[in-house]
Structures are given as C-alpha cells and as structure tokens.
Amino acid sequence: MKKSKLVVALAAILSCAAIPTTVMAESNVQQTMEKSNMSEAKKDLHEIYLAGGCFWGIEAYMERIYGVEDAISGYANGKSDKTNYQKIGITDHAETVKVTYDRNKVSLDKLLKYYFQVIDPTSVNKQGNDRGRQYRTGIYYQDTADKSIIEKEITALQGKYKNKIQIEVEPLHNYIVAEEYHQDYLKKNPNGYCHIDLEQANYVIIDEKDYPKPSDAELKAKLTPLQYSVTQNKNTEHSFSNEYWDNFKPGIYVDVTTGEPLFSSKDKFESGCGWPSFTKPITKEVVTYQDDHSFNMLRTEVISRSGKAHLGHVFDDGPKDKGGLRYCINSAAVKFIPLEDMVKENYGYLTNAVKE
C-alpha cells in the first residue's frame, strides 16, 4: 500500500495552474503546505515485521488497522540476503509483512494484540491451510527497545494457552520485498485465497492501560459533586433532566473518571426511561457487572472496567432485534465526545464504531 503525499499534489496543482500567481495565492499555498508539513511532523512512524502464514492475508488485515500507514509483503530472517517466492523453502525465509505505523495513533503492544487475533500462536510452521517453514509465525524488530514490549505481550499471550507459544521473536535480518505480484494481492484479487477473516480488523481493541484510574483526591478535584456521587457512591441522577438523555448526535460516551470509551451513539436508542439507553457497550470488555440488591430489588449493576465507576444498570427490556438489552446509564457517569472531535481527542480509532 503506497500513500500519496499532499505536498506533491499541491506542487502538481501549482505547476498546472492557469491563473496568475498573486501574493494572496502564494500565502494560501504556503499556509496549506505548512499545515501539511506540520501534520507530517506530528507522525511518529515506526516499523515492525510480522510473519503469520500467507502474507496476502496479513498485509490486507494490517492495512485495515487504525494507525497503520503502510504494509508491504516480503521475506524475512532467512539464510541469505537474496531469495524469491520459488526459493524461500531453500533460503528459509518467512513470508513477512513490513508494517509501518504511527505511534501517535497505535502503540506496538496494541498492534501485536491485533496480530494475535488472526494467528494460531501455538502452531509450528502452519497457519490455516498453509504448511511449511515459510509459514511460521514471527515478530522481527529493528529497534532493540521493541524487544521488551514484544516479550511482555508474548508472556501475556502465553497465559491464555496451555501449549507453548511458538512465535519466533528475533532481530530482523535479510528482509527482501516480495515480487510486485504479491503486493496488495487481495485488492487485485478480491476473491483470492486468504486464511484469515479480514473482518476481525473491525473488532476494536480498547486497551485498559491507556485509561488509568485517578486517585480519589484527583477524582474529587476533577469531578462535579454529582459526578462523584454517582460514580463513586452509586447514586442515581434525576431522569429527564440529565445532560445526555435526549442527545442523539453521533459520537462516543466515555467514562467520566478515566476517559475509557464505553458506548457509541450508534447503539443509543429512545427508551422512554429518561436516562441514556444503549443496546450494548462498544466492546464487551469495557464494562463489568455485579448484582445490586439495593432498595429491596435485584438488579445488575454496570461498572466501568478501568475506573471501577458506577455507570447504571442493565435490563432485559431492550429492543429484541438488537439483543434485548437496555443499558440504562447515568449522564453524570459519562462524557460525550462528538464524532467531529474524536480524532482531536485521540479517539480516532473508534470512528468506525460510530458511523452507521
């Protein structure tokens, strides 16, 4: 996948322009180019090399991840600095995708979590229907600082499996870009072979560590008395007079205590109860549950994962065609981030969770 540069496009436009160049035009172009350069400067590009079976699928999958700038199929960590598709069995290279990503948008540990979703990490020299050493799994790095991050994620992954994790972790060597035929193969051949489900890229990973819980003193300084009372003391605000009960603008609702994303406007509906109501959280992991026996009733309390904040309750009287649940949430427990502000507020990776 190759990215075009705005600066190049602007230069082409200027060279073809038939209008006279004025001071104002020059000023406008200069400002545009400066903004473009600033945008480029804000990027923190980094590379990691991922082997996970046939590189057609891994390349197409990684290109769909928010924050990935480029993905190129190639061959890595073989015995020689020359090879090709016909010789990789002899040179012992692994089919590997060079992933260039913006660390301001996606961290390496999160990128690896996406990678783990589409491989069998305990399999040796086999992924999907593909067999052979060239289909082994591997994470190859150039920056030595990446090694500890990779090893930490591998250790966490091992805790989920009984069998030993077989992912090769090594410094990168002998990387060779694959033939043009293999680049963007699934774009050129939409019905071509792919051993993974590319739709898994749409499952958003929300990392709890990105949204740490503040201390109680910090919460008291940060929250309004109502927000603190609701989230920390499990109180309930008044219906029909709270901030978001009738808000149906596109955006997300985040934990007011930590900023962790919780709900999407796409899943919000008018329930008639007077509080914001949702059919589900953005992902199932961002909330937890416990029985609530207060007021001589048995209800299921909804609690934010990272902040451990009281959010509200979940009931089974929601829309049947959307799962039948109604998450009844206090406005005071959440903060609304409009769709147009999500990138600016570092929630750009969730825009697809909002758009219909």
From Swiss-Prot:
The active site is at 54, 328 (nucleophile). It catalyses: L-methionyl-[protein] + [thioredoxin]-disulfide + H2O = L-methionyl-(S)-S-oxide-[protein] + [thioredoxin]-dithiol; [thioredoxin]-disulfide + L-methionine + H2O = L-methionine (S)-S-oxide + [thioredoxin]-dithiol; L-methionyl-[protein] + [thioredoxin]-disulfide + H2O = L-methionyl-(R)-S-oxide-[protein] + [thioredoxin]-dithiol. Keywords: Multifunctional enzyme, Oxidoreductase. Its EC number is 1.8.4.11, 1.8.4.12. Residues 216-339 form the MsrB domain. The keyword RNA-binding does not apply. PROSITE patterns: MSRB. GO terms for molecular function: L-methionine:thioredoxin-disulfide S-oxidoreductase activity; peptide-methionine (R)-S-oxide reductase activity; peptide-methionine (S)-S-oxide reductase activity. It comes from the Bacteria. GO terms for biological process: protein modification process; protein repair; response to oxidative stress. GO terms for cellular component: cytoplasm. Residues 46-199 are annotated as: Peptide methionine sulfoxide reductase A. It holds the Pfam family PMSR. Has an important function as a repair enzyme for proteins that have been inactivated by oxidation. Catalyzes the reversible oxidation-reduction of methionine sulfoxide in proteins to methionine. In the N-terminal section; belongs to the MsrA Met sulfoxide reductase family. In the C-terminal section; belongs to the MsrB Met sulfoxide reductase family. This is Peptide methionine sulfoxide reductase MsrA/MsrB. The gene is msrAB.
